[in-house]
A protein has these predicted regions:
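Short, glycine/charge-rich beta-strand/loop segments that flank catalytic centers
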Residues: 83-87, 110-115
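Hydrophobic or amphipathic alpha-helical targeting/insertion segments
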Residues: 96-110
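Conserved "HGTGT" condensation-loop signature of ketosynthase/thiolase-family condensing enzymes
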Residues: 1-79, 112-164
Length: 164
């Protein structure tokens, strides 16, 4: 049986985004509240009007409480997801499938990361089960090594790849 997707069952009706920059005056919870408030206000809602939330984060929180507390959500499920560099996409995918399944009428996916407040100099090299070899490269460093090889393999100009 082939999949026909969910594009006719789900609509993205709003979005919000804080500026990509160093926010020395704000914490991760402030950025999350700003993005969610911007998103809901654009369609005349408040955060508690949403049925369920999916929070995508890696370094900024270990549970859905990272969203539930600052947003003052009462009785709303918040699921935290993490999928390395696809964390935001994973949150959106889960929220979309929750609506498509009929479990919820409205769902909101939100991603937040603020690594420098936690003492990091940047995203660290995530540990996962391996052969025991110490990993020393961060995700960004690994991708910077892969990008030129990808460009050569697929005949893409590296300048075009940099603009993505």
């Amino acid at each position: 049986m082939s999949s026909h997707g969910i594009s006719d069952q789900v609509a993205i009706v709003s979005m919000g985004c804080t500026p990509f920059k160093e926010h020395w005056d704000k914490g991760a919870d402030d950025l999350l509240v700003d993005a969610v408030t911007q998103t809901t206000a654009a369609v005349g809602l408040v955060p508690n009007d949403i049925d369920a939330y999916w929070l995508g984060t890696s370094q900024s929180g270990a549970s859905g409480m990272m969203a539930a507390g600052p947003l003052k959500l009462e009785g709303k499920p918040v699921s935290r997801v993490e999928n390395y560099c696809a964390t935001g996409s994973e949150a959106l995918r889960n929220a979309a499938y929750a609506v498509a399944s009929g479990a919820y009428d409205t769902a909101l996916a939100v991603g937040v990361e603020k690594v420098k407040d936690g003492g990091y100099q940047g995203l660290n090299a995530f540990p996962y089960p391996t052969d025991g070899t110490q990993r020393t490269l961060t995700a960004a460093a690994m991708f910077s090594l892969v990008a030129p090889a990808y460009a050569r393999r697929y005949g893409i100009d590296e300048d075009d790849l940099r603009r993505v």
